[in-house]
């Protein structure tokens, strides 16, 4: 179908360009970081998909189809979204999963939050809008269901949980979160700015650690 849109003149021009100017391609180096804006875009779309998935699985109000107007309304709302906590309202220490607990130097009075702790808060609440989705994942995957959440889901739920248990001026230690750079970027664009990332020795080359190194926020233990 697409070949019909290519005119003979355009084909001749392409052949001439191919002969007169050979192209060279260079594979991106392993140290190259993905565009932050692209990651934010993926995070927004992922959040949208998660919200709609949770709605569609709600047994009391099933909905599997959405009009174009409904989709645009949700997407516009995501574009206008501001972070749950303003900059400097919440001190967030993010600790990677491989860091020994005894090596963590948390601020005085800081609240420790684990991923499973936040998810269980909503899974065990039968009146929560995400209860049905989380319950189904738990039934299939057991306690490891957090690894099978839709993209964007974990950050959305972590944000809701922190909004419930924290207030302006608090300090919080996120244990085992974020798990990757996409979650880190989504968290900072939707929930709060991460004050520092605590990483274990030997993780200096990971993209997540490199991302926070660019703003001097890495603590290696």
Swiss-Prot record:
Residues 1-23 form a transit peptide. The chain crosses the membrane at residues 36-54. GO terms for cellular component: mitochondrial membrane. It is a single-pass membrane protein. Keywords: Membrane, Mitochondrion, Transit peptide, Transmembrane, Transmembrane helix. The keyword rRNA processing does not apply. It is found in: Mitochondrion membrane. Its main location: mitochondrion. Belongs to the AIM36 family. This is Altered inheritance of mitochondria protein 36, mitochondrial. It comes from Eremothecium gossypii (strain ATCC 10895 / CBS 109.51 / FGSC 9923 / NRRL Y-1056) (Yeast). The gene is AIM36.
